[in-house]
Amino acid sequence: MNISITTEFIKLDQLLKYSGVAESGSFAKELIWEGFVSYNDEVCTMRGKKVYPGDKVRVHIPGEIDEEICVE
């Protein structure tokens, strides 16, 4: 999915909520801390990671969620 932002960046946990992949901030935080989120093809466990236009975020939980978010 493509997500457009109007700011310079968006924090990783906020992106997961904004995109609808995570229903709440606590679920977004859990996904990140458990290692289910990758940032530009590398696992990222920093919920405050700044995501800029052109970056790709993937959430992958085998058998449950497999979503790639492209920030524009």
How should these model regions be labeled?
Residues 1, 35, 55-57:
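Residue-level detector of beta-strand structural context in well-folded domains
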